[in-house]
Structure formats: structure tokens, C-alpha cells
């Protein structure tokens, strides 16, 4: 879908660039596949702010998305493509031949009326799901499982994809968007194609209020605060903070490595931090 630009009849429209969603379904989602969603405002169960700069925003209902795709060898037809406020990708409503309805992540080049199916030996076409062991090497995929049966976790955001680049002793070798290459079990399911809405990265909100509509509040810099609020705060006039960047709690940030998950290091064949040759 194309991008929309606007004549600058207001200041907020001068820089505004949004995705044209005119081809998406304009009605309400399927009620049986939705659930109420309450605002947390960045608070946890004790009422303390655990994520700063969140709150407000337009009311949403949560759409249940089928990330597992374990309804095997049952053909489904794409009824419509829909907008989902809870994610950057578009979603597709699928009606299976037995009458069941489900939402899946819509890949690029999936259209209303197309048929999708999940199984161990199905065609390699956008929207179909199958184990990595059944896919030809070189396939572009999304919604990739890390553990068989857990549901897709990798490449679910708008425009993202992974590529199957090889196999090794029952494991599949994937190249991710970040440049990382990692091993995943060949029994893990993945869907064919790249995720829809690739223009998402080109949008420009045009005004601060558009972020507020999404539930994002102003992100205040530490150097603009008082010393009581942040290690970078205070000083006479504008300052640079006077120290290497730290969080409000004094921990180094902006480039400080924080990964300490040694349990999965053995699955990473090439780090995303290695220089791309």
C-alpha cells in the first residue's frame, strides 16, 4: 500500500506521511476473536510506574492472532484484511472450510479470496505455514517459532522477514533482519513471505499529538531535569550532563552491552554485532 502526503493546510499536516489504508476492511473486528484491553499507564500490579512515558491513548480491543498455525491441512480463505491497533502489521481474517474463523498476520502479496493452508507438505506461497524442515533453502519467511508448538516469535513486525539459508543436523539456519544467523529446530513452524505494511518505517507523525493518540507521552531528557530527578540533571545553563550517559538509576546506557543469556548463545552462529562484510 502506498504512502499518503497532505497539503499543509495546518502545521501538523506539513510533515505528515501516513500509510494509505483505504484497501483495508472498514468495519469492526470479529467479536468472538477480540477481548477488552484495559490501559495500564506503564504501571505494574503494585501501581508503580515500571515503563516511563506511557499513558492515555485511544481505546483498543485486543485481537486474538493465531501465531501457532497448527490447524493442519485445512484450507482457509482470506475473508478480509484488517488494521490492528496493537501491532504494526496488518492482519487477515481466515475462514476455514469447517467454518472456523481465525486472524493471522497478513504477509505481503496476500489478497482477499486467496487460500492459505498449514501442513507438513504444502505449497511455498505467501500465507502458508509449514515446518522449517519442509521448506526449500532460500525461502523468505516470517512468524518463526523458536520452540516447536510455542507459536511464532521472530519476524512479526511490519515489513520484517527471515531467510532460511541452510540446514545442519536437524536444525535450520536462519538469517534475521538484524544480520544475525541462528539455529532453530527444523520442527518449528514458520509462515511463508514477508510481513505486510513494509512502508511503516517511512511514516511521519507530523505532530506530537499523534504519538499521544497511541498512548506515548513526552519523553523527557535527563539533562532537562533537576538533580533530584536524574543523574544528568541540574547545572547552570545548558549542560551536556557531565558524565557518560546513564539511566535515571545510574546504570550505564547508550551502547553498554546488557545481554547475559548464555543459555541461547550456542544457537547464535553469527552475532548481529559482527561487522557486515
UniProtKB/Swiss-Prot annotation:
UniProt-recorded Gene Ontology molecular function terms: rRNA binding; structural constituent of ribosome; transferase activity
PROSITE patterns referenced in this protein's UniProt entry, alphabetically: RIBOSOMAL_L2
Residue pairs linked by disulfide bridges in the UniProt entry: none
Keyword vocabulary terms for this entry: Ribonucleoprotein, Ribosomal protein, RNA-binding, rRNA-binding
Entry GO CC: large ribosomal subunit
GO biological process terms, semicolon-separated: cytoplasmic translation
This protein's record includes keyword Ribosomal protein: yes
Region (Disordered): 222-277
Origin superkingdom: Bacteria
Coiled-coil region: none
Subunit structure: Part of the 50S ribosomal subunit. Forms a bridge to the 30S subunit in the 70S ribosome.
Membership in a protein family: Belongs to the universal ribosomal protein uL2 family.
Functional note: One of the primary rRNA binding proteins. Required for association of the 30S and 50S subunits to form the 70S ribosome, for tRNA binding and peptide bond formation. It has been suggested to have peptidyltransferase activity; this is somewhat controversial. Makes several contacts with the 16S rRNA in the 70S ribosome.
HAMAP family (alphabetical): Ribosomal_uL2_B
Name recorded for this polypeptide: Large ribosomal subunit protein uL2
Species in which this protein is naturally found: Brucella melitensis biotype 1 (strain ATCC 23456 / CCUG 17765 / NCTC 10094 / 16M)
Amino acid at each position: 500500500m502506498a504512502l499518503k502526503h497532505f497539503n499543509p493546510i495546518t502545521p501538523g499536516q506539513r510533515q505528515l506521511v501516513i500509510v494509505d489504508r483505504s484497501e483495508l476492511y472498514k468495519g469492526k473486528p470479529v467479536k468472538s476473536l477480540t477481548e477488552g484491553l484495559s490501559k495500564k499507564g506503564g504501571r505494574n500490579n503494585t501501581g508503580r510506574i515500571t515503563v516511563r512515558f506511557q499513558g492515555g491513548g485511544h481505546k483498543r480491543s485486543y485481537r486474538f492472532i493465531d501465531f501457532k498455525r497448527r490447524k493442519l491441512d485445512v484450507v482457509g480463505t482470506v475473508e478480509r484484511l484488517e488494521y490492528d491497533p496493537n501491532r504494526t502489521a496488518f492482519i487477515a481474517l481466515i475462514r476455514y472450510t469447517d467454518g472456523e474463523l481465525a486472524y493471522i498476520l497478513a504477509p505481503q502479496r496476500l489478497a482477499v479470496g486467496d487460500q492459505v493452508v498449514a501442513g507438513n507438505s504444502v505449497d511455498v506461497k505467501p500465507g502458508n505455514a509449514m515446518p522449517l524442515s519442509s521448506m526449500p533453502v532460500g525461502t523468505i519467511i516470517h512468524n518463526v517459532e523458536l520452540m516447536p508448538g510455542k507459536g511464532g516469535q521472530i519476524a512479526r513486525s511490519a515489513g520484517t522477514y527471515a531467510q532460511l539459508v541452510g540446514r545442519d543436523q536437524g536444525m535450520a539456519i536462519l538469517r534475521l533482519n538484524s544480520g544475525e544467523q541462528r539455529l532453530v529446530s527444523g520442527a518449528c513452524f514458520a509462515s511463508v513471505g514477508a510481513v505486510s505494511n513494509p512502508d511503516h518505517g517511512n511514516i511521519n507523525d507530523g505532530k506530537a499529538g499523534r504519538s499521544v493518540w497511541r498512548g506515548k507521552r513526552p519523553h523527557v531528557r535527563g539533562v532537562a531535569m533537576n538533580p533530584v530527578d536524574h543523574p544528568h540533571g541540574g547545572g547552570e545553563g545548558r549542560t551536556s550532563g557531565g558524565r557518560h550517559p546513564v539511566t535515571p538509576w545510574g546504570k550505564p546506557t547508550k551502547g553498554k552491552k546488557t545481554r547475559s543469556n548464555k543459555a541461547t548463545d550456542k544457537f547464535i552462529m553469527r552475532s548481529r554485532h559482527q561487522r557486515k562484510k
